[in-house]
Design a protein with these regions (language model features):
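Intrinsic-disorder/low-complexity signal
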Residues: 1-179
Length: 179
């Protein structure tokens, strides 16, 4: 059974799923509907076209940067990005990142999952135009969702965010819902 998390809540992944070796991190969001204007009134509202990009940043001892896995660098350190979704349209995960926990270097202590809006300044876009944002973790071996964090705060004015992190503590993997 999946655990629904709140901002700042942590869970021990190693205790939730015994023998957990590989996770899929799904990130999703929807563009808010545009409102106002006579054309929107006549023809109905439309969604903004927002290109959000998910990334995973691997950190070593002492929070030292190791690598950034994103649409331009799809795999490194046994972390795999499944590709860029340019619109966020449709149901389900918009971008996915797989982490092979069993084969990560022992030097990696944490993986930070971030999302930014591509060309945000040029397009005058921020997370105030995003709704239904979430991050979820799935056990790759069973396909079962372990946990999910729905980001519900108002993030207007922000163009990049840390959604969550997976980190190693005393040999166990844990998840922290940051948002």
């Amino acid at each position: 059974m999946s655990v629904n998390l709140s901002k700042g809540q942590r869970i021990n992944l190693s205790k939730e799923v015994e023998g957990l070796s590989k996770i899929m991190v799904g990130l999703g969001w929807d563009a808010a509907k545009q409102s106002g204007g006579i054309l929107n009134h006549l023809f109905g509202s439309t969604s903004y076209s927002i290109d959000c990009d998910a990334s995973a940043i691997t950190m070593g001892n002492g929070n030292k940067y190791r690598a950034c896995i994103y649409y331009g660098n799809l795999s490194e350190d046994n972390v795999y990005h499944h590709g860029d979704n340019l619109t966020g349209d449709g149901d389900g995960d918009d971008e996915q990142i797989t982490v092979d926990l069993a084969h990560l270097s022992s030097e990696i202590e944490r993986i930070v999952f971030v999302v930014n809006i591509y060309n945000c300044t040029e397009r005058k876009q921020d997370f105030g135009l995003i709704k239904n944002a979430y991050i979820r973790l799935v056990d790759e071996s069973t396909g079962k969702e372990i946990c999910k964090y729905n980001l519900s705060d108002d993030y207007a004015g922000k163009t990049a965010m840390i959604f969550a992190e997976v980190y190693r503590n005393n040999g166990e993997w844990k998840f922290n819902a940051i948002g």
